[in-house]
Amino acid sequence: RTAGGWGAAIGAGAFLGLSAMFYTLFFVVAVFTVVLMGLVAWATLWWQQREIAVHQPRAPRLGVFRLLWPILLRLIVMGVIAAILALIVWAPYLAKVLTGHLPESNTALHYLPESGSRLAFPMFDFSEPLLGALCLLGTLWLVVRVASSRRAQALAISVVAIYLWSLASMLVTAAGTTGLAFRLEPILQVLLAAAGAFGFVEGARAVYQAVDEPRRFRAATAVVAVLGALAFTQSIPGILNAEITTAYTDTDGNGVRADKRSPSAVSHYGRIDQVLTEQTGRPRDETVLLTADTSFLSYYPYFGFQALTSHYANPLADFPARAAEIKRWTELKSPAELIDALNHSPWRAPDAFLFRRSGENYTLRLAEDVYPNDPNVRRYTVEFPGTLFADPHFRITDIGPFTLVVRS
């Protein structure tokens, strides 16, 4: 006897829970796909019952709920497992929401590049010929085998789910948001490429049998498969060209570029961190820093007062109000006014500021949401007059192009 699919249900629940911990979009799409699979399974059982009733009128029939219950029970188990794992990450946020701290702003879905306004058809995209051919082969295999192969059915439903999500994403654009369907294109490519691998194996077997099983056919097929894999492997740098360029030209946390050229201002981050910890006398996880150079926080995990853009900000942080508060600080007239404003900030005020210098003033590059434009953010600069920090309450240190201001 088999386990009746319970092993798969537990594994799927664990997968969904882990995806909820790392990438919400993929989690929601995965849940949508699993539910769609359940609906297809239920509809198939119902259709089979209907066919039996037509050909065998006296045969016993199960009701709609009796057909649905085993599927629904497995979905419930998956949901419980996924929820338990997801709460490891989501519990603090949900606790805040449930106690009345509702999100003031949430623009995570406000992004509509050109690729998000059309359906993706990787099987007809031959800018990367091998990937396109593999996806096309996968599409053909799904059409041919969807009625007889569980693997094909699972992959086909997943592909259909992505296309349905893409259509829904286009539809909700009218409501001022999106489903970020363009982010699912890599998943679509993986699904079709996996189907293409199955199609190649089964197609080669079918040809082998059709030509009377010649002795050297298997060897020839293996050679073609190996050469195809090598060719595809060699094309990966072309597919990842932008990412590879960034890897070689970006300055790392040690102030070094992989291409050995002069590093960017990031090379000063180590010194900034050293001075900041010395002057605050506190560990990083007890310090709030306001800076527009948020990559600094990637290397040194201080708490940031403001995110780079609203799309990546915690919805509970009220990104627009924080931006307005920062702008208000720049318009104050004296250090005493600034100190008072910081002491009465609606949120925990910055313990330090990391600026760029502009003459006698200090600048921050902030951003605001301008969806549905592409790019979806507008960058703007705010200037703090240097005179606002001319007080013993502030300790000022120039480091490279940066100015670090630490509150006493």
Residue ranges and their predicted role:
Residues 23, 27, 185-192, 224:
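Alpha-helical transmembrane segments of integral membrane proteins
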Residues 83, 204-245:
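Signature aromatic-anchored transmembrane alpha helix within multi-pass, membrane-resident enzymes
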Residues 228-330, 341-370, 392-407:
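Short periplasmic/luminal acceptor-recognition loop of GT-C membrane glycosyltransferases, typified by
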Residues 100-127, 155-217, 243-245:
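Membrane-helix boundary/interfacial segments in multi-pass membrane proteins
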Residues 2-9, 23, 175-178, 259-263:
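Alpha-helix capping and helix-loop boundary segments enriched in small/acidic/polar residues
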